[in-house]
């Protein structure tokens, strides 16, 4: 905005203010106007109250008339009754108002208050079935069912009609499992429903509670997840409000927390699903509001039941895997997808290696901190051949450093960069050394190290397990904290994160020192190598202490490995070996350059130099 525009706006503002002051009414005029407005408002308020009373009376009369003619008049009123089903792992509470599950307690897990974990209660959840009738629709949420056939593991919620017919909701809690079989069946209702009806509409809602210490970290792993038929599972965005109308038919829909889930499973698929996930504010006690609207099969004649299942339990990989075997449809539900184990190749490593190794070590009765320590050592031992190969590649480059320095001194000018590079590649080729020799071994190690990055935050076994100063390895260890929230850092400092960053800096310093071959042309890259460990403090400060502990131990072992390798490597013997290889290679090829990758790279550089020379010659013409 320029100066003239600012002056213009200022003048306009001055005129408006002056005009308002000039036309301001006197005190007497203002008093009369206020008295008039108060009188008008009083009359309007009395009229609004009269209309509201009339509307309420009319609504009540209409409701009474509707209720008295409804097929389910008797179910519109009643007293709420609660029924409990439980086994050794879960306790479920059912309400006859809506005939639904209204609370779930997981016996083997505790909340942050130390009591058995409440996954949800009546105020957190809702479920409504909408049945379309010929003359009226049934909305089950506000209707009162009659509990019958009650045992420790079964209950039938019956919605009775005035004509003697009924709709049954049958629930059966399976033994030693988190699964509940749920069946809907109509009886004597053929005349109520239209002949063409074959679906029921379902509205399922739940407020996902904050069950863990770290809100932001739990938010990353709390998502509405769904499984399309014959496809891999998918989920809505975890960090912002998301809504999706799914065109695929679905096997199941899950309201997922970081470590626990409520899952609704269809025997004959869900269709026309509309899914919504709304993040909640930190401090509200909730992570997200979930809503799922969908349809599924329904037979109004009652000849074929509508079969579904619930899973209320932990996101434990093998528990979910075993729950697949309880499927009524006999198809692989792939519930284990609720535990995110990373990208395809990393997921494969986690599924077949990491989880089995973790379970094996956990079976010894060791603390989870010791289990992570042993896992880190075992992983380091397994990748040691690749680590050794990578180190020896850098050691060979290091012993050739004097020759590289001679080439750098020979071609100090920038315009000689191509010749310098060409001669350097020729040197590597003579000695049989590849500057890329250490890259492939490092790439081979990456899937293993990345596997732990995805496994540890999703390992429910680490939840509420203490180690050293960390009371819970599944969340951050805030040994240093303060009241004010600092951007990017938060209100605490994780000691394991700090130790991880320090070891990373030391590892970087040592590695850069070992690999420095006198090439000063990449100072920006060196600076970046030192900045990244510092950035890790801000990135991982809110992550689980178990993950930071793993990276700290991994970095510490990495430094010790490099120090030991450096101490045990005789660089004079290594150089002598390279000289002997060079001589042998020269005799074998009669003084000509050898084959292999380095020779090909050298040939490509010569071809590049020839083409560049041709372009220069054409430019002179």
Swiss-Prot record:
GO biological process: protein insertion into membrane; protein transport
A single GO cellular-component term on record: plasma membrane
Disulfide bonds: none
Record GO terms (molecular function): membrane insertase activity
Key words of the record: Cell inner membrane, Cell membrane, Chaperone, Membrane, Protein transport, Transmembrane, Transmembrane helix, Transport
TM ranges: 1-21, 363-383, 436-456, 486-506, 527-547, 549-569
Keyword Secreted: no
Keyword Transmembrane helix on entry: yes
InterPro entries: Membr_insert_YidC, Membr_insert_YidC_N, YidC/ALB3/OXA1/COX18, YidC/Oxa/ALB_C, YidC_ALB_C, YidC_periplasmic_sf
Record localization: Cell inner membrane
Membrane topology annotation: Multi-pass membrane protein
HAMAP family xrefs: YidC_type1
Cited NCBIfam families: PRK01318.2-3 (NF002356), yidC_nterm (TIGR03593), yidC_oxa1_cterm (TIGR03592)
Subunit structure of this chain's protein: Interacts with the Sec translocase complex via SecD. Specifically interacts with transmembrane segments of nascent integral membrane proteins during membrane integration.
Function: Required for the insertion and/or proper folding and/or complex formation of integral membrane proteins into the membrane. Involved in integration of membrane proteins that insert both dependently and independently of the Sec translocase complex, as well as at least some lipoproteins. Aids folding of multispanning membrane proteins.
Similarity-based family: Belongs to the OXA1/ALB3/YidC family. Type 1 subfamily.
Protein name: Membrane protein insertase YidC
Source organism of the structure: Phocaeicola vulgatus (strain ATCC 8482 / DSM 1447 / JCM 5826 / CCUG 4940 / NBRC 14291 / NCTC 11154) (Bacteroides vulgatus)
Lineage: Bacteria, Pseudomonadati, Bacteroidota, Bacteroidia, Bacteroidales
């Amino acid at each position: 905005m320029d100066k003239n525009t600012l002056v213009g706006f200022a003048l306009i503002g001055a005129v408006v203010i002056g005009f308002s002051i000039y036309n301001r009414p006197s005190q007497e005029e203002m008093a009369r106007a206020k008295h008039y407005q108060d009188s008008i408002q009083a009359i309007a308020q009395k009229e609004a109250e009269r209309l509201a009373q009339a509307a309420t009376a009319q609504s009540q009369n209409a409701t009474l008339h509707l209720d008295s003619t409804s097929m389910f008049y008797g179910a519109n009123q009643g007293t709420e009754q609660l029924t409990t089903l439980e086994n050794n792992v879960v306790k479920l509470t059912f309400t006859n108002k809506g005939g639904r599950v209204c609370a779930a307690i997981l016996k083997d897990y505790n909340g942050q208050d130390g009591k058995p974990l409440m996954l949800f209660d009546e105020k957190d959840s809702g479920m409504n079935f909408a049945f379309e009738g010929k003359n009226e629709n049934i909305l089950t949420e506000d209707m009162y069912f009659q509990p019958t056939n009650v045992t420790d593991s079964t209950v039938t919620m019956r919605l009775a009609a005035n004509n003697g017919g009924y709709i049954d909701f049958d629930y059966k809690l399976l033994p030693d499992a988190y699964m509940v079989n749920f069946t809907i069946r109509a009886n004597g209702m053929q005349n109520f429903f239209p002949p063409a009806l074959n679906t029921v509409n379902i509205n399922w809602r739940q407020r996902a509670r904050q069950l863990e210490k770290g809100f932001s970290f739990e938010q990353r792993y709390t998502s509405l997840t769904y499984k399309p038929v014959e496809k891999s599972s998918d989920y809505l965005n975890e960090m912002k409000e998301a809504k999706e109308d799914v065109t695929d038919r679905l096997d199941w829909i899950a309201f997922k927390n970081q470590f626990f889930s409520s899952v609704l499973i269809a025997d004959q698929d869900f269709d026309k699903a509309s899914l919504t996930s709304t993040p909640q504010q930190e401090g509200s006690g909730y992570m997200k509001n979930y809503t799922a609207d969908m349809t599924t099969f329904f037979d109004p004649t009652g000849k074929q039941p509508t079969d579904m299942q619930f899973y209320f339990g932990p996101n434990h990989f093998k528990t979910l895997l075993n729950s697949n075997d309880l499927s009524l449809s006999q198809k692989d539900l792939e519930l284990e997808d609720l535990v995110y184990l990373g990208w395809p190749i990393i997921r494969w490593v986690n599924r077949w290696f990491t989880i089995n190794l973790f379970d094996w070590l956990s079976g010894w009765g060791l603390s989870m901190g010791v289990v992570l320590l042993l896992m880190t050592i075992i992983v380091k031992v397994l990748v040691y051949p690749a680590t050794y190969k990578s180190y020896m590649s850098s050691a060979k480059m290091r012993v050739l450093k004097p020759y590289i320095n001679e080439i750098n001194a020979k071609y100090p000018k920038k315009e000689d960069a191509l010749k310098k590079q060409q001669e350097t590649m020729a040197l590597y080729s003579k000695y049989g050394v590849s500057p890329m020799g250490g890259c492939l071994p490092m790439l081979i190690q990456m899937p293993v190290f990345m596997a732990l990055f995805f496994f540890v935050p999703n390992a429910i076994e680490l939840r509420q397990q203490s180690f050293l100063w960390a009371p819970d390895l599944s969340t951050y260890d805030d040994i240093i904290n303060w009241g004010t929230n600092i951007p990017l850092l938060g209100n605490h400092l994780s000691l394991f994160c700090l130790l991880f960053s320090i070891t990373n800096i030391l590892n970087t310093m040592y590695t850069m020192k070992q690999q420095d071959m006198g090439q000063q042309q990449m100072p920006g890259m060196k600076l970046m190598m030192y900045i990244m460990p510092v950035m890790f403090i801000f990135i991982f400060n809110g992550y689980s202490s178990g993950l930071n502990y793993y990276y700290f131990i991994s970095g510490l072992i990495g430094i010790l490995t490099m120090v030991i390798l450096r101490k045990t490597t005789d660089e004079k013997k290594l150089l002598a070996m390279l000289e002997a290889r060079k001589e042998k290679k020269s005799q074998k090829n009669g003084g000509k350059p050898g084959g292999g990758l380095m020779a090909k790279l050298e040939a490509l550089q010569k071809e590049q130099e020839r083409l560049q020379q041709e372009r220069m010659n054409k430019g002179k013409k």
